[in-house]
From Swiss-Prot:
Superkingdom field: Eukaryota
A Pfam family: Defensin_beta_2
Role this protein plays: Has a salt-sensitive antimicrobial activity against Gram-negative bacteria, including E.coli, Gram-positive, including S.aureus, and fungi, including C.albicans. Binds to and neutralizes bacterial lipopolysaccharides (LPS), abolishing TNF production by macrophages challenged with LPS. Rescues the LPS-induced reduction of sperm motility in vitro and may protect from LPS-induced lethality.
Single GO molecular function: chemoattractant activity
Organs and tissues of expression: Expressed in epididymis, predominantly in the caput (at protein level).
Disulfide bonds: C29-C57, C36-C50, C40-C58
Gene: DEFB114
Signal peptide feature range: 1-26
Record GO cellular component, one term: extracellular space
Entry protein name: Beta-defensin 114
Localization per record: Secreted
Swiss-Prot/TrEMBL keywords: Antibiotic, Antimicrobial, Defensin, Disulfide bond, Secreted, Signal
């Protein structure tokens, strides 16, 4: 069973994570008008994962994105 979890983790890190977001440092997040924090507010969206432990890059949502769905 342990090998199954190991393979699942490798698959996630190799295929799924790079397709959804990238690891960025705090300076790159700031250049994209975001901030590295633990949780995004409801008025913000996640754009990347910061290289800092357990932090994500959050930026403000545009009003057009709220009405999209």
């Amino acid at each position: 069973m342990r090998i199954f979890y190991y393979l699942h983790f490798l698959c996630y890190v190799t295929f799924i994570l790079p397709a959804t977001c990238t690891l960025v440092n705090a300076d790159r997040c700031t250049k994209r008008y975001g901030r590295c924090k633990r949780d995004c507010l409801e008025s913000e969206k996640q754009i990347d994962i910061c290289s800092l432990p357990r932090k994500i890059c959050c930026t403000e949502k545009l009003y057009e994105e709220d009405d999209m769905f």
